[in-house]
Amino acid sequence: MSRSIKKGPFVDAHLIKKVDTAVAGKDKKPIKTWSRRSTILPEFIGLTIAVHNGRQHVPVYINENMVGHKLGEFALTRTFKGHAADKKAKR
């Protein structure tokens, strides 16, 4: 079930504060955050946000197609190495 429209999108308060200071200061440094649950707002467009994936911070450049999605969708937490090749199929 999606979030109620009357509540509005959820964004952590500390992330909004960091974005506001970056926009006001024209700062191009990535904003480091652990808040994967925050929704991307139109104010974030053009910023680079380093989202934590459990091991490191993955830089995510925000564009207009990402608005409305969560930050965690763009920082993958699992790495797929591929399945082992079948020995019978090789012969």
Swiss-Prot record:
One example GO MF annotation: rRNA binding
Coiled-coil region: none
Family annotation (InterPro entries): Ribosomal_uS19 (IPR002222), Ribosomal_uS19_bac-type (IPR005732), Ribosomal_uS19_CS (IPR020934), Ribosomal_uS19_SF (IPR023575)
Name of one Pfam family that matches: Ribosomal_S19
Alphabetic keyword roster: Ribonucleoprotein, Ribosomal protein, RNA-binding, rRNA-binding
GO biological process: ribosomal small subunit assembly; translation
GO cellular component terms attached to this protein's record: cytoplasm; small ribosomal subunit
Family that this chain belongs to: Belongs to the universal ribosomal protein uS19 family.
Described purpose of this protein according to its UniProt entry: Protein S19 forms a complex with S13 that binds strongly to the 16S ribosomal RNA.
Protein name, entry field: Small ribosomal subunit protein uS19
Annotated source species: Bordetella petrii (strain ATCC BAA-461 / DSM 12804 / CCUG 43448)
Lineage summary: Bacteria, Pseudomonadati, Pseudomonadota, Betaproteobacteria, Burkholderiales
